[in-house]
Amino acid sequence: MKRFMTLLLAMLMVLSLAACGDKSSATVDAEGLGKALAERVQFDSTMSIIDAGDYLELPEGSSAAAFMSDGSTMEEIFVVSCKDKTDASAVKIAMQSLLDSQKQEAERYQPEEAERLGSAVFGTYGTCVVLCVTSDTDTANAVIKEYVG
């Protein structure tokens, strides 16, 4: 009986530790999050679906959603869900490079857009990388939190 109780307690401990595992590595629905951002966040221009692969080199096995402004603003959404953190890190570097080049261009011709690019919501959530260029950053962060926990 004493052995059984020891085994039972050990199993309960393992299960409770597993419940505290890294939830940030859970797969994020890139299309769902991208669509939710496009629909719920306030943008100054109409957002249209684009092919993320036209702007970023996407790793094999990743899924992506991307939207860009139809107007003269630099508002955009990129959501890329990768198969592992190594791929997510590479995507984040590529997104940062894209963002930096856009900022540099905007500083010359659209200073107000450079400011918006500078305050973009940009981060890695486990294996998902999100970039949302908008003035409505509070809503964007809330929507992202719903999807990534």
Regions found by a protein language model. Give the residues of each.
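Short Gly/Thr-rich strand-loop-strand
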Residues: 85-125
